[in-house]
């Protein structure tokens, strides 16, 4: 009997009538989905409200039979409408729309469950359970495991005690619950539900097949999730699935005690496909467990059961990986060939298998594999080649052997042919990039030969169109650089010329300069440097690079020329690669390495001074410590160049260098005593070198030079107190004394060159110096000698200097008798020229008498021999003129002086006898009358010790 044939009960309570009316209207709206404008969300909400009301009514009083039948009729209509809606493409939508439809679907079994099981409806409980089962599957497909499980759990009690013919529904429910548990991550519950279903599945081969599929599905999920529960193993699940397949395929699998519903004989399902699928997944599980023998056993069983149809491609892949894992590369090679011959294998799968094989076999097998792929992959051959080459490159051990294998691989004509055509533009670019990157890695490792080989092969994948012009030029330039590094200079020049043809730019011009420099062709390098400067994309940075390259090649001229040209660009208000001061420093440093470059160094040092004045110290040299170092470098360089030029007697250069040093030292930290001390020294040295240049060139200083020298000395004089060291150190004090002397000496010299007489000022200058602690006898001797020379000698200054020299020297703890003797000689000469007391002979005699007093009592060798001989000879010879003039008294005085000096000086002993004889003869000739002045004019005792009185004959 059908539900529609049941007699309705018309005496319904009024409250139920309203609910039935609302339900009927809602069902009608669901049925008329094509013409109704009611939104699915509203339908779902209405059904939820009606279900809530019915549940409330059922809890207060049980439904009558007629009411239950009405609800069943409406619930069945609702289910049929839901099925129609699901089959309609008009309601297809996203996950949210499908969730609403699933909620409407679930309302049907919920209504039937509320209505209860009416009498006369066959298998009513099984139908409700089936509706819940299908509703749960809908939720499961949407990923709502909680709602799906709720549906399954409501359905299970309805059929758990069902008759034999309804146990199929219970099996389906258990399988669905197992799937839901697996999706929720509860693999243990899923396995328990599958185990609980074994008695149900034993009733028919189809049931066994369904359970086997359930085990396989849960096994796949477990394998994919790598479930950590040791009680649940994917291999066990796959084995269970295989056992069920075997039982289902057996003719005796159906129990005679449980005949099928309707009495029909069950058909044995085709389980070979399912078995092979189970074997594939079991092999995969064994492969993950690295049980390579287990993998191969599964594959053998699968292949043994295979008919004429093609095997699944994954079988070949797993077999190859298993052979690789067991170390049998020959069998792995065979499996790879078999896979490529399999028409079902996709190109992507073949390439992936080839990558795995090459990762184990190494680059030596790449050529064979790539040729096979070229024949196998018709549409994606270029992409396959790219993947294989990438695998070889990324395979590790990036040595030269691997690079050579790559080069041979990509240069094969069959491989290159795969990239022909406009459709492979992307693959060509990728292959070029792979080879380029590999080549640059070897370049960074300084394997230039290998790098050049790879870069050259990469050009096979660069088209000759306009878009690839820049890339081709880059390749040519890198090839040129590699050959430069290998010293294949002619070959490098060929490549850079090709690059220049493709894309003329400054990079090519610079490489030509580099090659010419390394070949030692400076003239060609000069020409190419001019070409480089004229390039449209000229960048001053390349002049800096040229200078560095020229210095490394010891090409002094090119380095200087490049820096000189670079220096000329700093006034153009353009960004420059390095500060102007750094260019000047490097240029001067280069010039200072070569002899005879003082003029050039001076020119650029002047430029530095001028730019410092124009821009300011910090703007030109920089601020902080760096700027201070730059400034000190120029100051020290000027000082050192001044010393070098002076040593080489290039006084014109030396004077200006010292003048520049003073300017640099005074330009920063003027309040610093150390800097002001250096300024003072530099100014004094500048004037000193000017005077030396005048003497060397024998050309008087100009009035402007004299004026400048006076100004510099005046400026230095104000700074002289700063020269003395704060802490007394012998060497520093000596240097300070020397500069004080030089200042005095130079000032004396310039005073003598002024237009007006300056004898008093000169004398006062020497007196001031003589009273200072810096004064030494040697300084006074030099001043005295200088004062006695020249066109306008200052005799007063000379006499004062020489006398002060003698006095100072005698007062020292260790008198320097060489200085004293020189001063005595000069003083004697002055006395011979001018008698300060009005008597020429008396002034000279006083000097000799002073000399006699000094030498008496000296140790042998203390007084210089040659000076002593000069004193004796000069004193003796002074008697010659008086003798001729018959001035016996004067002659006797000088002869006795010479004889007395000879007795006390070394080296005169041989002559004393002859001198004594001569003197005695003179006495006889001059007469016997006593000499009135003999006692008065005889030499007095030495101030340094006692002496015997000369014997008067």
Curated annotation (Swiss-Prot):
InterPro entries: Spo22/ZIP4 (IPR039057), Spo22/ZIP4/TEX11 (IPR013940), TPR-like_helical_dom_sf (IPR011990). It holds the Pfam family SPO22. Disruption phenotype: Complete loss of fertility due to defect in meiosis. One of its GO terms (biological process) is homologous chromosome pairing at meiosis. Residues 248-269, 925-953 are annotated as: Disordered. TPR repeats lie at residues 129-162, 432-465, 473-506. Residues 943-953 have a biased composition (Polar residues). It is found in: Nucleus; Chromosome. One of its GO terms (cellular component) is chromosome. It comes from the Eukaryota. Keywords: Chromosome, DNA recombination, Meiosis, Nucleus, Repeat, TPR repeat. Gene3D superfamilies: Tetratricopeptide repeat domain. The keyword Nucleus applies. Required for crossover formation, complete synapsis of homologous chromosomes and bivalent formation during meiosis. Is specific to recombination events resulting in interference-sensitive crossovers (class I meiotic crossover) and works cooperatively with MER3 to promote crossovers. Interacts with HEI10 and SHOC1. This is TPR repeat-containing protein ZIP4. It comes from Oryza sativa subsp. japonica.
């Amino acid at each position: 009997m059908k539900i529609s044939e049941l007699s309705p009960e018309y005496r319904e309570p009024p409250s139920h009538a309203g609910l039935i009316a609302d339900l009927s209207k809602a069902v009608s709206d669901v049925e008329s989905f094509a013409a109704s404008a009611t939104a699915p969300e509203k339908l779902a909400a209405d059904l939820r409200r009606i279900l809530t009301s019915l549940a409330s009514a059922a809890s207060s009083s049980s439904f009558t039979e007629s009411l239950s039948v009405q609800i069943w009729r409406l619930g069945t209509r609702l289910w049929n409408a839901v099925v129609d809606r699901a089959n309609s493409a008009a309601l297809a939508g996203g996950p949210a729309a499908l969730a609403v439809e699933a909620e409407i679907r679930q309302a049907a079994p919920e209504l039937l469950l509320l209505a209860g099981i009416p009498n006369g409806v066959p298998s009513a409980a099984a139908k409700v359970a089936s509706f819940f089962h299908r509703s749960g599957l809908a939720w499961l497909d949407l990923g709502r495991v909680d709602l799906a499980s709720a549906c399954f759990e409501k359905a299970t009690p309805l059929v758990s005690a069902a008759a034999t013919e309804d146990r199929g529904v219970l099996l389906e429910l258990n399988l669905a619950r197992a799937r839901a548990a697996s999706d929720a991550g509860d693999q243990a519950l899923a396995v328990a539900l599958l185990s609980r279903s074994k008695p149900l599945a034993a009733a028919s081969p189809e049931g066994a097949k369904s359970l086997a599929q359930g085990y396989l599905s849960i096994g796949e999920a477990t394998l994919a999730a790598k479930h950590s529960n040791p009680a649940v193993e994917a291999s066990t699940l796959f084995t269970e699935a295989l056992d069920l397949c075997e039982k289902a395929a057996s003719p005796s699998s159906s129990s005679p005690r449980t005949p099928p519903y309707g009495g029909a004989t069950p058909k044995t399902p085709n389980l070979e496909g399912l078995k092979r699928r189970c074997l594939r997944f079991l092999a995969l599980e064994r492969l993950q467990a690295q049980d390579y023998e287990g993998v191969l056993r599964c594959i053998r069983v699968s292949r043994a059961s295979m008919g004429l149809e093609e095997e699944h491609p994954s079988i070949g892949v797993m077999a190859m990986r298993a052979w690789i894992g067991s170390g049998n590369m020959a069998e792995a090679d065979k499996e790879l060939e078999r896979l490529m011959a399999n028409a079902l294998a996709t190109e992507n799968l073949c390439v992936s298998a080839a990558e795995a094989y090459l990762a184990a076999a190494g680059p030596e097998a790449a050529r064979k594999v790539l040729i096979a792929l070229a024949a196998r992959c018709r549409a994606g051959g270029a992409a396959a080649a790219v993947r294989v080459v990438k695998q070889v490159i990324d395979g590790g051990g990036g040595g030269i052997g691997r690079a050579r294998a790559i080069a041979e691989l990509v240069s094969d004509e069959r491989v290159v042919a795969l990239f022909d055509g406009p459709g492979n533009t992307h693959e060509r670019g990728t292959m070029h990039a792979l080879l380029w990157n590999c080549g640059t890695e070897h370049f960074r490792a300084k394997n230039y030969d290998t790098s050049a080989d790879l870069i050259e092969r990469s050009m096979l994948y660069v088209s000759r169109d306009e878009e690839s012009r820049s890339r081709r030029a880059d390749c040519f330039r890198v090839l040129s650089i590699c050959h430069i590094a290998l010293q294949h200079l002619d070959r490098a020049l060929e490549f850079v010329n090709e690059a220049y043809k493709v894309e003329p730019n400054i990079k090519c011009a610079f490489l030509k300069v580099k090659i010419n420099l390394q070949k030692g062709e400076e003239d060609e390098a000069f020409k190419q440097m001019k070409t480089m400067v004229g390039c449209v994309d000229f960048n001053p940075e390349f002049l800096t690079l040229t200078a560095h390259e020229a210095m490394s090649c010891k090409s002094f001229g090119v380095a200087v020329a490049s820096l000189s040209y670079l220096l000329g660009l700093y006034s153009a208000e353009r960004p420059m690669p390095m500060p102007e001061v750094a260019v000047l420093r490097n240029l001067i440093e280069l010039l200072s390495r070569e002899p005879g470059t003082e003029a050039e160094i001076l020119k650029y040092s002047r430029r530095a001074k001028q730019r410092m004045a124009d821009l300011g110290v910090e703007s030109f040299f920089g601020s902080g410590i760096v700027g201070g170092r730059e400034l000190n470098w120029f100051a020290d360089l000027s000082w050192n160049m001044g010393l070098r030029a002076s040593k080489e007697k290039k006084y014109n250069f030396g004077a200006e260098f010292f003048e520049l040093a003073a300017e640099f030292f005074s330009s920063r930290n003027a309040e610093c005593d150390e800097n002001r001390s250096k300024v003072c020294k530099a100014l004094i040295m500048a004037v000193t070198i000017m005077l030396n240049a005048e003497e060397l060139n024998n050309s008087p200083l100009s009035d402007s030079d004299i004026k400048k020298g006076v100004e510099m000395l005046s400026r230095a004089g104000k700074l002289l107190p700063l020269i003395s060291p704060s802490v007394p150190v012998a060497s520093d004090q000596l240097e300070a004394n020397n500069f004080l002397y030089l200042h005095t000496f130079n000032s004396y010299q310039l005073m003598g060159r002024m237009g007006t007489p300056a004898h008093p000022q000169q004398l006062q200058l020497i007196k001031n110096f003589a009273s200072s602690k810096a004064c030494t006898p040697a300084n006074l001797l030099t001043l005295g000698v200088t004062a006695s020379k020249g066109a306008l000698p200052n005799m007063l200054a000379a006499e004062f200097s020489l006398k002060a020299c003698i006095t100072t020297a005698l007062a020292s703890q260790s008198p320097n008798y060489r200085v004293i003797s020189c001063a005595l000689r000069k003083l004697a000469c002055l006395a011979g020229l001018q008698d300060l007391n009005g008597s020429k002979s008396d002034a000279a005699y006083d000097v000799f008498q002073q000399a006699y007093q000094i030498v008496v009592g000296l140790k042998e060798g203390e007084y210089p021999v040659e000076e002593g001989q000069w004193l004796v000879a000069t004193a003796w010879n002074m008697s010659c003129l008086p003798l001729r003039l018959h001035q016996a008294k004067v002659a006797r005085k000088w002869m006795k002086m010479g004889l007395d000096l000879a007795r006390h000086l070394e080296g005169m002993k041989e002559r004393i006898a002859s001198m004594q004889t001569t003197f005695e003869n003179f006495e006889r000739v001059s007469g016997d009358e006593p000499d009135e002045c003999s006692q008065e004019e005889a030499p007095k005792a030495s101030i340094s010790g006692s002496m015997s009185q000369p014997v008067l004959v």
